[in-house]
Design a protein with these regions (language model features):
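A short beta-strand-turn-helix
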Residues: 84-133
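Structural microenvironment flanking redox-active thiols in thiol-disulfide oxidoreductases
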Residues: 131-184, 196-199
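Hydrophobic membrane-insertion alpha-helices, especially the h-region
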Residues: 44-62
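Short, Lys/Arg-rich cytosolic juxtamembrane segment immediately N-terminal
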Residues: 31-44
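Thiol/disulfide oxidoreductase modules built on the thioredoxin-like
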Residues: 130, 179-187, 192-239
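Ser/Thr/Pro/Gly-rich low-complexity linker/stalk segments immediately outside membranes or between
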Residues: 34-36, 62-79
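N-terminal intrinsically disordered, acidic low-complexity segments at the extreme N-terminus
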Residues: 1-32
C-alpha cells in the first residue's frame, strides 16, 4: 500500500495543507536551470561571409564585358594590339576596327588593318604606342570607374613624355558619352568601344590600366583603382 504522509490528519487539515502547498508552488516556482547551449561551428560566420562575397562576385561578373578566361588584361611583355575607334569628342561613326593584319580583315573586325586608319577624330593605338602609354579601360556599368580617369588627368601634366588615353566601353548614345567626357574635363583621347577592344585586351575588371613603353610593349597591367602617386610612379617607370 502506498504510504500517505498526511494519513494522520483530518480531511479538512489535509485539504488546508494541500492549498498552502499549491499557493507556495504558485508564488515560489522552482527555478529552471538554463539550457546548456549546443556546441556550434565557430567558423559558420566565416562561411556565411564567403557565401555572400561569392554571390557578389557572381552578380558583378554578370555585368562584365569579357567573361572568358582572359579577364586580367595583357601580360607584361606583350605588345598592345592595334585598334582604331571613334574619339568621344569627334564625329566619326562606326564600330572600332580591331583588324591586326590585312590577311585576317573582314566585315566583323574591320575590312582594313586598324593601324592604317589615321584621322583627327579617330583614336588609333598604333599612334598612341609611339610614346610610353598609360591606357585606361572603363565601363559605364558595374562600378564607378570614372574617377580613375580623373586621376590620370591630374597626373598627366607631370609626365609630359607619356601619352594618356582611355577606352570607354559604353552602350550610351554618342551625345551622352560626349557629355560625360566634357563635363569631367577629360582632355586625353577617349576611344568609344562597343566591346571589341575590351575583349581584344582581355579586360574584365573596371578600371583596368595598362602601362606600356614606347613601341607598345606592356610593362604591367593594374586592376582596380590606383592613387595618383601610383599612376605617377608607374608612368615614370615606363619612360625608362
Amino acid at each position: 500500500m502506498t504510504e500517505d504522509r498526511f494519513e494522520d490528519l483530518g480531511a479538512e487539515r489535509r485539504a488546508e495543507i494541500g492549498d498552502q502547498l499549491a499557493e507556495r508552488d504558485r508564488t515560489h516556482p522552482e527555478v529552471r536551470r538554463p539550457e546548456v547551449p549546443r556546441p556550434g561551428n565557430k567558423y559558420a560566420w566565416a562561411v556565411g561571409i564567403v557565401a555572400i562575397m561569392g554571390l557578389s562576385v557572381l552578380l558583378f561578373a554578370e555585368t562584365l564585358p569579357n567573361k572568358g578566361k582572359g579577364l586580367f588584361g595583357l601580360k607584361p611583355g606583350r605588345v598592345i594590339p592595334a585598334f582604331a575607334a571613334p574619339n568621344a569628342l569627334g564625329n566619326a561613326e562606326g564600330d572600332p576596327n580591331i583588324c591586326q593584319r590585312a590577311s585576317r580583315c573582314n566585315k566583323t573586325i574591320g575590312t582594313v588593318p586598324a593601324c592604317s586608319i589615321v584621322a583627327p577624330e579617330v583614336v588609333n593605338s598604333c599612334q598612341l604606342r609611339r610614346k610610353p602609354l598609360v591606357l585606361t579601360f572603363i565601363f559605364d556599368r558595374g562600378a564607378d570607374c570614372y574617377p580613375q580617369v580623373d586621376r590620370t588627368e591630374r597626373v598627366r601634366p607631370s609626365v609630359p613624355g607619356v601619352t594618356f588615353a582611355t577606352v570607354f566601353f559604353t552602350n550610351k548614345k554618342r551625345d551622352q558619352a560626349r557629355a560625360i567626357v566634357r563635363d569631367r574635363g577629360w582632355r586625353q583621347p577617349v576611344a568609344l568601344d562597343d566591346k571589341g577592344i575590351t575583349d581584344l585586351y582581355g579586360v574584365g575588371v573596371c578600371p583596368t590600366t595598362v602601362f606600356a613603353r614606347a613601341g607598345g610593349r606592356v610593362v604591367t597591367t593594374r586592376l582596380g583603382n590606383l592613387t595618383e602617386d601610383q599612376i605617377r610612379h608607374l608612368a615614370h617607370r615606363i619612360e625608362r
